[in-house]
Amino acid sequence: MVPQALLLVPILGFSSCFGKFPIYTIPDTLGPWSPIDIHHLSCPNNLVVEDEGCTNLSGFSYMELKVGYISAIKVNGFTCTGVVTEAETYTNFVGYVTTTFKRKHFRPTPDACRAAYNWKMAGDPRYEESLHSPYPDYHWLRTVKTTKESLVIISPSVADLDPYDNSLHSRVFPSGKCSGITVSSVYCSTNHDYTVWMPESLRLGTSCDIFTNSRGKRASKGSKTCGFVDERGLYKSLKGACKLKLCGVLGLRLMDGTWVAMQTSNETKWCPPDQLVNLHDLRSDEIEHLVIEELVKKREECLDALESIITTKSVSFRRLSYLRKLVPGFGKAYTIFNKTLMEAEAHYKSVRTWNEIIPSKGCLRVGGRCHPHVNGVFFNGIILGPDGHVLIPEMQSSLLQQHIELLESSVIPLMHPLADPFTVFKDGDETEDFIEVHLPDVHEQVSGVDLGLPNWGEYVLLSAGTLIALMLIIFLMTCCRKVDRPESTQRSLRGTGRNVSVTSQSGKFIPSWESYKSGGETGL
């Protein structure tokens, strides 16, 4: 790129000096000299480059970069992540329910993401409800899976817009760049298959608010436009301009690095890919005003000198230097040969260094060769000193050159806001930090016995069941004891047989119940 400051194309433009501002103008072609009267002298209009005969000025509107515009153009957007929450329940024989939550991801659709974003921005409760975990269902002795899809919106997510090709740059994009946003495709892929990036506004061009409308004067000849006078009063040539789009707006990049959008019928080529434009900042505007003031001052000095010449009817070499054209283009050259005032048509070019026109002692280079002098006199106040050196009056005046150098130092190229292409997420932790899914972590929940009763009912039922079980145990133990006692008595009687003896009431020994019975019968 050859960044040349935008402003002094008149003073300094048309220079093929690799972007440097000229410090002087000198004819590269000089017509034949002819004598004139002092009343034919005139001061040039240094605010307009009268090149190629484009002297017709007409008002028009054009578009340029805003003052104070910063190269980084921020585009607000949001990320949309598709999340599937799965609830798995199992109910065992006694009614214990085990619930396990799992989370997976899916790639969302742009339309669904836009709807979810609108819900979130509007405070619609449907967005919050969509993030809740699914209500798990369950059935006895069965495993039940319940899934729910959610879209997690994270905003803002800011990307940098490249005004040259409308691409977006951010660390969330693959390789740090997204070029896919068009009318039909309004999203960007990210480093994660399940997350997409979308701009907050459907119209991406609204984020590129870097232009302003200005008024100026078009310099033309017929249908051809040679240049224009900008809003600040400086002339800018279209020579060497090329077509360049910024944020999709077609415009012209001038030789000094300025970008303007204007209607012209001129055939212009497209700029090379490496051509950038210069920023339009407050400092350059201030210096432009200083240069304009200096040009106006130079014109006033020229008019004062011209008035003095006409009034006194005398002219000097020093006064002729005020009549030199300060900008490139067609003009006049004046000199005095043998006490005769002479005039010649000339085409001025820019000079970057004094060595270009004074390569050696006594040599004034014009048109590629040393220009001859007449008795030590050249033209436009340039003379040959007594020591043989070429003397140029403007070599002693550096104020305008200081302004020009300040302007040159204030040129700031509008660079591509490229993000670091090597900053791509590689670690899992960085990935999770980027996603920031605002959902519960994967966890497992085991419930108590679920019989469909409230908590107090479950406690009453449990207490009653425990009491009934205790009473049942006591009853069974009692019954078991009563059954065991008669069985043991019968076994003992069967074991003695007839050897049982008893004692009667009279005190006699009776060997058996039968004997006792028969004796009783006898006694009776």
Swiss-Prot record:
Biotechnology: Primary surface antigen capable of inducing and reacting with virus-neutralizing antibodies. Almost all human and veterinary vaccines are based on the functional aspects of the G protein.
Lipidation residue positions, type S-palmitoyl cysteine: 480
Glycosylated position list: 56, 266, 338
Miscellaneous field: Arg-352 is highly involved in rabies virus pathogenicity. Its mutation dramatically attenuates the virus.
Source organism: Rabies virus (strain Nishigahara RCEH)
Stretches that traverse the bilayer: 460-480
Cystines in this chain: 43-302, 54-226, 80-113, 178-188, 208-247, 242-271, 363-370
Outcome following mutation: residue 471 to V: In strain: RC_HL
Virion surface topological domain residue ranges: 20-459
Keyword line: Disulfide bond, Glycoprotein, Lipoprotein, Membrane, Palmitate, Signal, Transmembrane, Transmembrane helix, Viral envelope protein, Virion
One Gene Ontology biological process: entry receptor-mediated virion attachment to host cell
Family of this protein: Belongs to the lyssavirus glycoprotein family.
Role according to the record: Attaches the virus to host cellular receptor, inducing endocytosis of the virion by using different host proteins including TFRC, GRM2 and ITGB1. In the endosome, the acidic pH induces conformational changes in the glycoprotein trimer, which trigger fusion between virus and cell membrane. There is convincing in vitro evidence that the muscular form of the nicotinic acetylcholine receptor (nAChR), the neuronal cell adhesion molecule (NCAM), and the p75 neurotrophin receptor (p75NTR) bind glycoprotein and thereby facilitate rabies virus entry into cells.
InterPro entries referenced in this protein's UniProt entry, alphabetically: PH_Rhabdo_glycop, Rhabdo_glycop_CD, Rhabdo_glycop_FD
GO cellular-component term (any): virion membrane
Protein name: Glycoprotein
Topology with respect to the bilayer: Single-pass type I membrane protein
The keyword Transmembrane helix belongs to this UniProt entry's keyword annotation: yes
Topology feature Intravirion, residues: 481-524
